[in-house]
Amino acid sequence: EKGWGVFGVELFVLTDGSVLFNEVSPRPHDTGMVTMASQRLSEFALHARAILGLPITQEHVALSIPDGAVAASHAIVIQGDGEAEFRNVANALSQPGTDLRIFAKPEVHGHRRMAVALAIGTDEADARAKAENVAESLEIDIA
């Protein structure tokens, strides 16, 4: 069948170099949220344009970060049972070039990805370090 829009493909690269397939989802995947920091239109906006039959040009997929800059994301996975409360957000986002997307998931039971930290850096290591710093600076309570 023919499909329109974004298909998220999740693969795992093991330490021995082998690749394992995990899933294909006919929608944007949260691991692609880095596009909200790096591109003019995110994967979510591009998905909407595709399924609505709207044109997608080079202008739509253009990067929105300075030449040579790199974007990175860091998933925030919470373990527990109850509602998650995010605190210390302003401090976590005090470094320029950082952002945080908290998902509208009402509660966590076990392990659940609840947010993603986004960052722009001068290189991959810088962007990753900034995103990790945002995640580590958050205070998360489970009630």
Task: Indicate where each model-derived feature is located.
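Short acidic-glycine loop/turn motifs at beta-strand connectors
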Residues: 14-17, 121-123
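Active-site "cap" helix and flanking loop/linker of ATP-utilizing ligase/carboxylase catalytic domains
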Residues: 1-9, 15, 25-82
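Peripheral (often C-terminal) accessory segments that flank ATP-dependent C-N-forming ligase machineries
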Residues: 49-143
